[in-house]
Amino acid sequence: MWRKRHNLPTNPRYKMTALSSSASSSSTPLLDQPMYAFGVLADIQYAPIPDGHSYSGNPRYYQHAKEAARHAALHFQEEEVQCVINLGDIVDGKCADVEKWGGTIDEEKKSEGYSGSGSSSVGHEAIDDVLEALSSYKAGRLLHTYGNHELYNLSRLELGHKLSIPFIREPNNDELVGYYDHILHEPQRQCDSDGDTWKLRFVVLDSYDICLLDRCADTSLKRKAAHEILSKHNPNYPEQENSPEGLIGLSRRFVAFNGGVDTPQLEWLENSMKSARENGEKVIICSHQPIHPQSSFTTCLIWNYDDVLQIVRKYSDVVLASFSGHAHKGGYVRDEESGVHFRTFEAMLESPRPVRTYAFVDVWKDRLVVRGMGDCYSDTYDLDHLENKVGAVSEI
């Protein structure tokens, strides 16, 4: 089952290739295996409620999503991928009021204080249920980003405990932020006989660093910044804070279900890129919200996407690609200026039974191969932009 084909890049400086993923990696000779392989999940959004629709009318399969995640985990384990990237929204915001959406809460649990919020809640239990579904994957680490839907159910502190996101408090700031990196030091598979390999660094961004969600209305400077951004750019705010009605083009990103990246995180990102360059590593950037304005619907972009994009372009000699979720239909663009690939992955939530939507990514020295399952589009992304930067790094 395939969605409409992604737009292919048109920049003549780079090769244009697209391959289907019908060939199994198990048939590939040992010396012709990718250096790294990992799994990708996006927008599971499980909730213990009947199937429904988004606010714009798209069908959503809340309970099937959990079973699709279970199948994906078994498949990831079978192929022994080195890690799995969850691009956020592991549960749906409707967990906060399941009875409104046709779900039920056991009367005994109600009497014990079980509700739509708090430490004893549907949201907490729903995340536990999805983590149990993913528990069959044991070959490597499960790297989580978080999105708006997690914050409709849990605090950042609770998410840190549940998802092992290493939230920190920035200097001179008591507010939690959840950006981090993870390095695969050794290739899982030998790619060729010359032994020329590199370490792979995953840089996981917190795109809800500046936002309204789970930030104290009285004391949070980040919430204050979010309030000022939305007040300036969206006349629907605050009465209809999630509405882009009347907004045009890129301005449609200024809604409350999005967020931004604060200065300390931008500085951290720059330092992480410098470190990768100095150590001869290559980088894949992961975030819930998309970074490039042509890689998804504009209503899903990071508020200050341009600040992040500027850093990515500066270090395009090390950045292979940027992967995100949030925009459920998916999308893709190759940045004309840098050659970096920006891919938004299709949501698991919107695939009906028996379709299970997720992806494998195989990392070769000269290309990334996305092997899409279900409604996830497959493609091959050439890494010839790395070749074009050879000898020019010292000028940056």
Locate predicted features:
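N-terminal active-site segment of His-dependent metallophosphoesterases
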Residues: 2-123
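Extended active-site neighborhood of metal-dependent phosphoesterases/phosphodiesterases
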Residues: 11-14, 28-30, 56-59, 95-277, ...
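Residue-level marker for buried hydrophobic side chains located in beta-strands
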Residues: 38-40, 84-86, 144, 285, ...
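Active-site glycine-centered loops adjacent to acidic/histidine catalytic or metal-binding residues
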Residues: 43, 88-89, 147-148, 205, ...
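Short, solvent-exposed loop/turn segments at secondary-structure junctions
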Residues: 48, 93-95, 99, 292-295, ...
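Short acidic, glycine-rich surface-loop motifs adjacent to enzyme active sites
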Residues: 273-294
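Histidine-centered catalytic micro-motifs
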Residues: 285-291, 320-330
